[in-house]
């Protein structure tokens, strides 16, 4: 769907009816047990699978992904896990969260920009200890 503004649905008469598609941001986070490459990659992969699955997103829907890590996590780029999942044509970026005193450590966050059916509301996914970050979201786990 990348680059398309509307998706067509064929009726039985053969005409094409268009439905609106919009660009939506999907948010999520996961906690990481240790500053180790394997732990960061595993937590990122679980987070991405959950976000994509719960929102019915496919690789072709994705526009970009922005990953952030808390300052205590620097053993690996989360984008490596996304590439291993097959997101080879999706622009990915990694950055460090600001070090706010007293904030939760050991956290990977992601914001996925994707095209989605207009009727669908985004399901934001917060796994592990990060569920405490956004208790206000119905989609938070």
Annotate each PLM feature:
Residues 1-141:
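Terminal domain-initiation and capping elements
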């Amino acid at each position: 769907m990348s680059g398309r503004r509307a998706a067509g649905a064929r009726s039985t008469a053969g005409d094409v009816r268009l439905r609106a598609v919009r660009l939506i941001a999907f948010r999520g986070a996961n906690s990481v047990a240790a500053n180790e490459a394997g732990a960061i990659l595993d937590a990122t992969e679980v987070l991405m699978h959950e976000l994509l699955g719960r929102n019915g997103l496919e690789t072709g829907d994705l526009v970009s992904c922005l990953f952030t890590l808390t300052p205590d996590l620097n053993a690996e780029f989360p984008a490596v896990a996304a590439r291993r999942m097959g997101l080879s044509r999706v622009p990915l970026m990694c950055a460090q969260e600001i070090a706010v005193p007293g904030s939760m450590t050991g956290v990977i966050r992601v914001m996925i920009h994707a095209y989605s059916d207009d009727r669908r509301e985004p399901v934001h996914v917060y796994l592990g200890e990060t569920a405490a970050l956004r208790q206000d979201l119905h989609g938070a786990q």
